[in-house]
Amino acid sequence: MEGKRPQFGNRHLDDPSRVFQHNAWDNVQWSEEQESAAHKKVQENSVQPLPLEKQEEYENKASNFWDDFYTIHENRFFKDRHWLFTEFPELSSRSSTQTGTESQEGQVMQLNGCQEETERADVENPFPGASATYRIMEVGCGVGNTVFPILQNNTDPGLFVYCCDFSSTAVELVKSNELYSPSRCFAFVHDVSDEQSSFPMPEHSLDVIVLIFVLSAINPAKMQNVISRLSSLLKPGGCILLRDYGRYDMAQLRFKKGRCLAENFYVRGDGTRVYFFTQDDLDTLFISAGLQKVQNTVDRRLQVNRGKQLTMYRVWIQCKYVKPQETELQNGGCSSE
């Protein structure tokens, strides 16, 4: 898929004089001058990282800052992410992306090998969603802006969705939502960066893991361990789907001096943190965890405030990495095409 554009990126600005005719333009290429100016801005706002004691405070109290965030904003800050089904078909009902025969064959295949091993473990140690045939987990679920669209749109009777966040406030907001159903979903508090914390499901049991603007909130020194732990939960053929902040995104360039924790890692005014990735950063993390690249694409988007005649350059990265199959069967699991 290298070089092939994914589903986003269908509105191109060919005539700069038309920039204010739409709210956003996709796949906007930067000039050398823009790239140089962005690099200079990052150098300026990163020249003096915060003292180590302050960095440790933000690390040790990370969940508290996110609790405060969700206490203030509840479910009003983020919009539901219905665009996910266009970008990541793996989150839709399997019947909507496969023929009936293919779907049945995929389910039969999943009962072989690793799936049988998981089911034997189910009998000995039952876990939430043990009887499901397709399991999705979202890490850093917040108040459910990804989880609930999945539950609403994916009617697969074999689906079970896990969602976790290290903010207990966020998890309680998920559980109190009228769309939350324990028969189809299990929400739990979990710090994915803590290697001592255990997951409620066994290894090799998940088909899809979703990371939407989540990995960037984790200390870069802990990211490799996080991805490796998550990789161990995937079935062969399962995948991790990611969308996150890219290097020189508008949000990075807006940071003032005194907010930098480490190279390309910052703390916001509310105490929450954010890292800005390159494609190579993410490729190294996933490949080192034993996963194979299906997609690793930069989404450079020009957002426009037509009322104020302002332009804002956003940079996001979208990835799909797959756990290698243990057999030559390629049906089911995550698509590599």
Curated annotation (Swiss-Prot):
Major subcellular site: cytoplasm
Compartment(s) where it occurs, according to its Swiss-Prot or TrEMBL record: Cytoplasm
Top-level enzyme category: transferase
Alphabetized Pfam families for the sequence: Methyltransf_12 (PF08242)
EC id: 2.1.1.-
Molecular functions (GO terms): tRNA (cytidine) methyltransferase activity
Single biological process term from Gene Ontology: tRNA methylation
Residue stretches spanning the membrane: none
Keywords (A to Z) from UniProt: Cytoplasm, Methyltransferase, S-adenosyl-L-methionine, Transferase, tRNA processing
Positions with a binding annotation for S-adenosyl-L-methionine: W66, Y70, G140, D165, D191, I212
Reaction equation(s) it catalyzes: cytidine(32) in tRNA(Thr) + S-adenosyl-L-methionine = N(3)-methylcytidine(32) in tRNA(Thr) + S-adenosyl-L-homocysteine + H(+); cytidine(32) in tRNA(Arg)(CCU) + S-adenosyl-L-methionine = N(3)-methylcytidine(32) in tRNA(Arg)(CCU) + S-adenosyl-L-homocysteine + H(+)
Any Gene Ontology CC annotation: cytoplasm
Keyword match Nucleotide-binding: no
Source species, domain of life: Eukaryota
Cited InterPro entries: Methyltransf_12, METTL2/6/8-like, SAM-dependent_MTases_sf
Keyword Cytoplasm appears in the UniProt entry: yes
PANTHER family in UniProt: METHYLTRANSFERASE-RELATED, TRNA N(3)-METHYLCYTIDINE METHYLTRANSFERASE METTL2A-RELATED
Assembly description: Monomer.
Function: S-adenosyl-L-methionine-dependent methyltransferase that mediates N(3)-methylcytidine modification of residue 32 of the tRNA anticodon loop of tRNA(Thr)(UGU) and tRNA(Arg)(CCU). N(3)-methylcytidine methylation by mettl2 requires the N6-threonylcarbamoylation of tRNA (t6A37) by the EKC/KEOPS complex as prerequisite.
The family this protein is said to belong to: Belongs to the methyltransferase superfamily. METL family.
Protein name as catalogued: tRNA N(3)-cytidine methyltransferase METTL2
Lineage, broadest ranks: Eukaryota, Metazoa, Chordata, Craniata, Vertebrata
Gene name in the database record: mettl2
